[in-house]
Amino acid sequence: AKRERYSGRWLLVHRKGATRALPAGHEDNPSCYRDTGHPAIIPGSMGTGSYVVLGTHRIKDTFCSVNHGAGRVMSRKRAKSEFTKEDLVKQMGHVVTIARSMKSLLDEAPLAYKDIDEVIFTLVEAGLTKPLVKLSPMGVLKGEGSEG
């Protein structure tokens, strides 16, 4: 949580699943972003693109907050049971993957996430963000976790 000023009032803003996207001219911007706005990254899945965006002046309507990812369309458990290793290979295309096994990546399958292009389109159509660049993944490295 962070203390921030909105409409002359100090508020405690807690962003869960969101990130700050300060527009141009916002007093909390570092000097290097004062004229442009502070870039925010909105990641897609490990097999799709991610975007770097700028908040517009309308972003103040959301306390200068924007979602910090595409969002899931299915749970990790469902993704593990719904997708096969072969499905994952198709979904990943030419993205290089390094993991202890393809099975360990199933819960992060690209089709378990919303379409990042549609998410960005919605934010732009709502007048909240302006996309600067779309990034495409070249490789994914998944470390070992405690999951089985």
Task: Tell me the role of every PLM-derived stretch.
Residues 1-148:
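Domain-length cofactor-binding catalytic modules of enzymes
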